[in-house]
């Protein structure tokens, strides 16, 4: 073969190789990754890998590592900004709570839950956080029989003034005689819902059956209406701000007469036959059933478990010493509350006013049992 023929054949061969190669790298399957086997499943996306390898190599003959690093830095920057944004939506205990401000009292439990006393919380930080969350707080109260005319109006009027000021509140009022409910003018962000409940012959049964009623209403509608729910006795009156520092997953109230007493002296249910039984040597605090709360799901758990215990006691023909309160204390022994309110939040002035009570949020009303209870 002459020289001219060899040159032509060589040129054809080179052209063919170049054409095949070019077609290959531009095909969906084309990639340099065929030369090794990767165990990384993300490396099997050949089209993505081809886009990474080839445009850079043919960009003025220089692979664009710098651009790759800049893209990585941008991604890291976005992740860092997202973390910072997430941090601003989280409220950590140490952001608002300082137990050292009240060294003379118990401010932290053995399970590291805060005991909220006046002076231990930063109200500004809490208000700023919850304002952004746009929360709704429910307050449920029972007024049965003569409790309606003796206590209900003053309770709701004072709650309208002091309870969760600046936040949306729904008052759930459970009564056995709806026409007797007084008209109460509420402030902005407050609404009032009245529900009729079945009356019971004994006040003990009213207290115990309230656990069932609370649970039923949470399931029926409250869980969809509020972010937090408090259940309170009606024979109390607010006299100072009861605010967002009290909000938590599950919230228990220290009983004013028992917060300095040794647990073995608490009036727990001590009979083994009762579902509310707590043996000597056990117990953390004595909790008052006049106030408890938390998220709707947690309050549902509290009321359902307490009512189970009440039904079991009825089946065994026994009644716990302090009825629903005994079962509440048993519940919180087994399921520790995430936050505890000091006696400042529910105080009895008959005790006096010791130095550790800096302010009284919600004092007890005078207990006129002879006027409001059918069976004393």
From Swiss-Prot:
Mn(2+) binds at residues 233, 235. The keyword Membrane applies. The active site is at 325 (nucleophile). Its cofactor is Mn(2+). Disulfide bonds: none annotated. Its main location: Golgi. Substrate binds at residues 142-147, 233-235, 255-258, 267, 367-373. The chain crosses the membrane at residues 5-25. Pathway: Protein modification; protein glycosylation. One of its GO terms (cellular component) is Golgi cisterna membrane. Binds 1 Mn(2+) ion per subunit. Residues 26-376 are lumenal. It is found in: Golgi apparatus, Golgi stack membrane. Keywords: Glycosyltransferase, Golgi apparatus, Manganese, Membrane, Metal-binding, Signal-anchor, Transferase, Transmembrane, Transmembrane helix. InterPro entries: Glyco_trans_6, Nucleotide-diphossugar_trans. Belongs to the glycosyltransferase 6 family. Synthesizes the galactose-alpha(1,3)-galactose group by catalyzing the transfer of a galactose residue, with an alpha-1,3 linkage, on terminal lactosaminide (Gal-beta-1,4-GlcNAc-R) disaccharide borne by a glycoprotein or a glycolipid. Preferentially glycosylates proteins, can synthesize galactose-alpha(1,3)-galactose on glycoproteins but cannot synthesize the glycolipid called isoglobotrihexosylceramide or isogloboside 3 (iGb3). This is N-acetyllactosaminide alpha-1,3-galactosyltransferase. It comes from Alouatta caraya (Black howler monkey).
């Amino acid at each position: 073969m002459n020289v001219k023929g060899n040159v032509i054949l060589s040129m054809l061969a080179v052209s063919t190789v170049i054409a095949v190669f070019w077609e290959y790298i531009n095909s969906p399957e084309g990639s340099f990754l065929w030369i090794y086997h990767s165990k990384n499943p993300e490396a099997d996306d050949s089209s993505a890998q081809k886009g990474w390898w080839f445009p850079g190599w043919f960009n003025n003959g220089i692979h664009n590592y710098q651009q790759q690093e800049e893209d990585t830095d941008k991604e890291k920057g976005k992740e860092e900004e997202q973390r910072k944004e997430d941090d601003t939506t989280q409220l950590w205990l140490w952001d608002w709570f300082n137990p050292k401000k009240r060294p003379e009292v118990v401010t932290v439990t053995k399970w590291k839950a805060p005991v909220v006393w006046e002076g231990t919380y930063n109200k500004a930080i809490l208000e700023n956080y919850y304002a952004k969350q746009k929360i709704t707080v429910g307050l449920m109260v029972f007024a049965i029989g003569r409790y309606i005319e003796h206590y209900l109006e003053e309770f709701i009027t004072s709650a309208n003034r002091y309870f969760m000021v600046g936040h949306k509140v729904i008052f759930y009022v459970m009564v056995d005689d709806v026409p007797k409910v007084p008209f109460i003018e509420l402030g902005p962000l407050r609404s009032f819902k009245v529900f009729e409940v079945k009356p019971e012959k004994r006040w003990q049964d009213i207290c115990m059956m309230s656990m069932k009623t609370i649970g039923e209403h949470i399931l029926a509608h409250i869980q969809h209406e509020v972010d937090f729910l408090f259940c309170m006795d009606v024979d109390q009156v607010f006299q100072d701000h009861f605010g967002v520092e009290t909000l938590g997953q599950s919230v228990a109230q220290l009983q004013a007469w028992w917060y300095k007493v040794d647990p073995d002296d608490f009036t727990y249910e001590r009979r083994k036959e009762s579902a509310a039984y707590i043996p000597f040597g056990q117990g953390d605090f004595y909790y008052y059933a006049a106030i408890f709360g938390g998220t709707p799901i947690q309050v549902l758990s509290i009321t359902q478990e307490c009512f189970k215990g009440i039904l079991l006691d009825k089946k065994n023909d026994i009644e716990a010493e302090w009825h629903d309160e005994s079962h509440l204390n048993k519940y919180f022994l087994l399921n520790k509350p995430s936050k505890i309110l000091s006696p400042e939040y529910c105080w009895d002035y008959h005790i006096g006013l010791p130095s550790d009570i800096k302010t009284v949020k919600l004092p007890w009303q005078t207990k006129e049992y002879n006027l409001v209870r059918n069976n004393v």
